[in-house]
Amino acid sequence: MEGRRLSQLDRVIINFDDALRTVFGQPRTTERASPASGIAEGALSEKERRLSGCLMRVNHAGEVAAQALYQGQALTARLTEIRKAMENAAREENEHLVWCQQRVQELGAHTSYLGPFWYGGSFVIGALAGMAGDKWSLGFVAETEHQVVKHIERHLDRISAQDAPSRAILEQMKEDEARHATVALEAGGVELPSSIKALMGAASKVMTRTAYWI
């Protein structure tokens, strides 16, 4: 579809394809190499390995949700440059998704069985945020990323120092998420009301606690 302006229907179809790729197939990425490439894993106990698997499953579920949030916002964004920024961020989130999926498998764990639910719910939230206006949509991105950074920091505190591959992935994700937040604010994002922040935090806890086990 290069060379012509995409219609809203085109974007809906592309979003549907991205949803299928994210939840069931191979998502679109910029093909950046995993930070864990070439990093040796230390001697993990069975307990440490199980904990890492559960936490990386949570991170994978979070990236499924992040991908959906960005795609939902891109679909309803009013300004073309905002839409493109959301789509580019979604590609980078997909890199995180692939990295986490690979690491989950290496740890002998499985990704969340509720992936379609995480994607669908987050896509709707993202679309609604986009409909509220670009400044609020960008503010939503910034707050989401701030919360994700804190969440990653908590995981880094729990994952064994012997699990160098998982830690390398999380450190890079933390850096990327912090940058997304800064870019969103610099592009005109506004700070969200404390009540919205609290609601976002509560929803995040439900997802992380559920994905830890399922």
Swiss-Prot record:
Fe cation 2 binds at residues 93, 145, 177, 180. It is a peripheral membrane protein. Its cofactor is Fe cation. Binds 2 iron ions per subunit. Keywords: Cell membrane, Iron, Membrane, Metal-binding, Monooxygenase, Oxidoreductase, Ubiquinone biosynthesis. Pfam families: COQ7 (PF03232). GO terms for cellular component: plasma membrane. One of its GO terms (biological process) is ubiquinone biosynthetic process. It is found in: Cell membrane. Fe cation 1 binds at residues 63, 93, 96, 177. Its EC number is 1.14.99.60. It catalyses: a 5-methoxy-2-methyl-3-(all-trans-polyprenyl)benzene-1,4-diol + AH2 + O2 = a 3-demethylubiquinol + A + H2O. GO terms for molecular function: 3-demethoxyubiquinol 3-hydroxylase activity; metal ion binding. It is an enzyme of class 1 (oxidoreductase). Its main location: membrane. Catalyzes the hydroxylation of 2-nonaprenyl-3-methyl-6-methoxy-1,4-benzoquinol during ubiquinone biosynthesis. This is 3-demethoxyubiquinol 3-hydroxylase.
